[in-house]
Design a protein with these regions (language model features):
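Acyl-donor binding region in acyl/amide transferases
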Residues: 54-150
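Short, His- and charge-rich active-site/binding loops that engage polyanionic ligands
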Residues: 32-62
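Charge-rich, low-complexity intrinsically disordered segments
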Residues: 139-192
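Intrinsically disordered, low-complexity acidic/polar segments
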Residues: 36, 48-50, 81, 118, ...
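Short amphipathic alpha-helix that is part of the acyltransferase structural core
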Residues: 1-36
Length: 192
């Protein structure tokens, strides 16, 4: 699915999930048994993050301040599926893994300029530095950042309110409620 979606967007390279990498967690969303979306969370380690290839200077700033970093990579979602709930569920579970299970403080994502506004508006990311070329996909990329405590505040405030989101235009109302998050986090921690 990743190669199909990336090729459709004109990105170069072969993209595969790294099942044998203990610092990467890949999730998928299914609809009636068919995978409709996938995303990977990379946890910082001595080998670093994929974003270090072009944004190491910016990531090192957060490391130097004592941050524990993670990154979102390999997001692919079937464009025929218009489900904010499915997309929000994938992101919420990623944030649970990052913050609650791996105790990360900061999350990063490299995005094509055409997707930057989505992440800023829908998930509260902020742009860092200047645009650079990502050699893994041979395309321009921005490095976006979000503080996971800030993400958690938004989840606590808006999660589970999609039936009455008010003026909130982000994905956070489609995230799980706090009670649902607690149950999911307990189950994820119990399986290791």
């Amino acid at each position: 699915m990743i190669n199909k979606m990336y090729a459709w967007r004109g990105y170069a390279g072969t993209h595969r999930l790294e099942e044998d990498n203990p610092n990467r967690i890949s999730l998928s969303a299914s609809d009636r048994g068919e995978v409709v979306g996938t995303v990977t969370l990379g946890i910082d380690s001595p080998v670093g993050l994929l974003a270090d290839e072009i944004f190491k200077d910016q990531l090192d700033h957060f490391r130097d301040m004592g941050g524990k970093l993670c990154e979102i990579t390999k997001l692919a979602f079937d464009p025929r599926v218009r489900s904010k709930e499915a997309l929000a569920a994938l992101f919420h579970i990623l944030f649970i893994y990052g913050r609650r299970i791996h105790h990360c403080t900061d999350v990063f994502i490299e995005v094509n300029p055409r997707h930057r506004r989505f992440y800023e508006t829908m998930l509260g990311f902020s742009c860092l530095g200047e645009m650079r070329t990502n050699p893994r996909v041979n395309a321009p990329a921005w490095l976006l950042w979000n503080n996971l405590d800030k993400v958690q505040e938004q989840i606590e405030r808006f999660g589970g309110t999609s039936s009455h989101p008010g003026n909130e235009r982000s994905l956070f109302p489609f995230f799980f409620s706090q009670k649902e998050e607690e149950g999911i986090a307990r189950r994820l921690m119990s399986i290791g």
